[in-house]
């Protein structure tokens, strides 16, 4: 039996993901992380919005919420305030997080709420038919951009840093070892931890732009990734089309829920 199965709702299998989808890689990395941290199913709550990646919590053997489009961070905030003893993990995608959920993303970072947000970024809307998302690279094709997108792309990690997150990292599905380490750090971080995972979507993004073969897409992700330390010495032209990976931020500052409960206790004593 696969070691991850004990952490999964086996009655929900088989999953709905397309063959070669990166969601399974990310889910496996997450399960490895909680196993290495010795986190039991009753110790964490998984929250998601709408989209392919948002189906991940439905397969996890834990308490979970499958919420409305773009709102998982809002729901997760309420959970963390009510149950600060629980690890709260949000699974989201580039459309769910950066488009309709952009406001919640910004203010979750700003408040520095103790959440671990894992964004599986496949550069496209996968579940609804391959439309352009906020992270679709300039010039890349989608069903709503058959001649190539003319929109500027959003850098999710830069947004998280600017908005106030305390841990920010980016990897791809071709970096599972590094991803496990970052998920562990994110869960242990007392504050808003944002982990972006650039993932393959062979059904839409790959078929339109790279290859419909998952192995080709993972090879592409690996070969086009540049570590942050190397990227610092490269020009903007040299970085064009590359994926900068690594840990961008790891700092400490007051966490929202702790500050809220301190205020409550202070007011009780007055």
Swiss-Prot record:
Biological process (GO), any one: organic acid metabolic process
Enzymatic reactions: 2 oxidized [2Fe-2S]-[ferredoxin] + 2-oxoglutarate + CoA = succinyl-CoA + 2 reduced [2Fe-2S]-[ferredoxin] + CO2 + H(+)
Keyword DNA damage tagged: no
Enzyme Commission numbers on file: 1.2.7.3
Pfam families named among the record's database cross-references: TPP_enzyme_C
Swiss-Prot/TrEMBL keywords: Oxidoreductase
The protein's name: 2-oxoglutarate synthase subunit KorB
Organism: Methanocaldococcus jannaschii (strain ATCC 43067 / DSM 2661 / JAL-1 / JCM 10045 / NBRC 100440)
Lineage: Archaea, Methanobacteriati, Methanobacteriota, Methanomada group, Methanococci
């Amino acid at each position: 039996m696969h070691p991850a199965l004990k952490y999964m709702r086996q009655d929900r299998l088989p999953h709905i993901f397309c063959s070669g989808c990166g969601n399974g890689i990310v889910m496996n990395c997450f399960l490895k992380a909680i196993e290495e941290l010795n986190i039991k199913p009753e110790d964490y709550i998984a929250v998601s919005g709408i989209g392919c990646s948002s189906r991940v919590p439905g397969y996890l053997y834990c308490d979970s919420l499958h919420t409305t489009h773009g709102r998982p961070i809002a729901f997760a905030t309420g959970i963390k305030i009510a149950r600060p003893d629980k690890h709260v993990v949000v699974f989201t995608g580039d459309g769910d997080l950066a488009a309709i959920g952009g406001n919640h993303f910004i203010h979750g970072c700003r408040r520095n709420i103790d959440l671990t947000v894992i964004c599986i970024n496949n550069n496209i809307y996968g579940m609804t038919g391959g439309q352009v998302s906020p992270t679709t690279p300039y010039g890349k094709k989608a069903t709503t951009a058959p001649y190539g997108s003319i929109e500027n792309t959003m850098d999710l990690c830069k947004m998280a840093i600017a908005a106030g997150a305390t841990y920010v990292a980016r990897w791809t599905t071709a970096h599972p070892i590094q991803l496990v380490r970052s998920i562990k750090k994110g869960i242990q971080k007392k504050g808003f931890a944002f982990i972006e995972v650039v993932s393959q979507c062979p059904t839409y993004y790959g078929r339109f732009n790279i290859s419909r073969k998952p192995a080709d897409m993972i090879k592409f992700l690996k070969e086009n990734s540049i570590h942050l330390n190397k990227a610092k010495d490269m020009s903007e032209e040299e970085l064009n089309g590359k994926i900068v990976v690594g840990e961008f931020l790891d700092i400490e500052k007051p966490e929202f829920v702790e500050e809220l409960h301190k205020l409550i206790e202070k007011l009780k004593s007055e």
